[in-house]
Amino acid sequence: EDNVKPGDTVLDMGTGSGILAIAAAMLGAEVRTVVDIDENCLRTAQENAEKNHVSIGRGLCGDALRDEKLAEDIGSGYSVIVANIVADVIIGMAPMFFAKTAEGGTLICSGILNERADEVRAALEKAGFEVVNHAKSDDWSAFTAKK
């Protein structure tokens, strides 16, 4: 809630059920794109958005790390990127996240086991992000980073 405001443009990488995209839309953000490697997740996310009377933009399916066309189709200039995915994927995507985030924009990544948090933080910083918050809950970590 503290990082998403009305008018923000949002990309949700690894959308799953769409919960983060839906929350962003409910906060007044313009969710432009949701991405997942599973077509069923994209369908579920769209259904959940409809049930909540919000739009979560276009759904793209595939592996953005391996599919250059998909990576290009995702676009760039997002004021907020949310990603609730495992540490290895966040580490691999950190440079892509940086490239797709608008200047002054925010990356919020979660789904990170605490024992992998230092690796994720290092990858985000190496990509050019400034980590501004590291939240922990039980075995899990989340980072907020600025470009």
Label the predicted regions:
Residues 115-127:
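Short alpha-helix
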